[in-house]
Amino acid sequence: DLDKSGVIDPGEFKVDDHGDLSIIGNQQARYRFGINLAANWNGIGLSVFLQGVGKRDWYPGSDAGYFWGKYGRPFFSFIPAIHDYTDDMYDPEKNNWDTAYWPRITSYQSNGTNNWTKVLEVPNTRYIQNAAYVRVKNIQVDYSFNRNVCDKLHLQGLKLYLTAENPFCYTPLHKYAPNFDPEGLSYDTDFASAAQGYTYPILKTFTFGINVTF
């Protein structure tokens, strides 16, 4: 009861009458960074490019099925391993109300009609996700053969390399939203944009090649 009115409600959804609603989180990406690392030793080369965002909050859209799972629409039960509900879901037999992250399973709790009758339809601090991340955008390992080998092969230069694009991404987001890519998140401003998490993730690419100089 933030407004001390004795009733928990959203007021008139206006700036001057917002009831118990308050601003939570910040979905803007802050502290963007990039790091280039490179090293060479005895013909062996290694280069790594890291990129990421130091701070960003994200709240799942009301119809983000890959986050809410069965708490949204019941047919999401056909999609395996959305969540492991066994330990983090409230169970009256375990009486784990103080440690469970998820409430008791009931369908259509996240995608309500904005009338405050559903448990999960009102954004709250409990389910704000940490969408900061660091991604290995590019990593390359190469080996340049020495002059003796090149001379025997009548070459000016010979190098083997293996390159990986987007091979790894670390983000706290994947604790409860493993199917989401932090770079592909959108903003849930209305129900038209609420169905999040259905875009293809950034692809991983691996390339092996040979550079030959005659």
Sequence positions of predicted segments:
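C-terminal beta-signal and terminal closure region of outer-membrane beta-barrel proteins
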Residues: 71, 89-92, 169-214
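Membrane-embedded beta-strand positions in outer-membrane beta-barrel channels/transporters
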Residues: 34-36, 138-142, 207-209
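Outer-envelope beta-barrel architecture signal
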Residues: 31-33, 42-44, 132, 154-158, ...
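Repeated loop/turn-to-beta-strand initiation elements of outer-membrane beta-barrel proteins
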Residues: 43-47, 148-149
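Extracytoplasmic gating/loop element in the C-terminal half of outer-membrane beta-barrel translocons
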Residues: 55-159
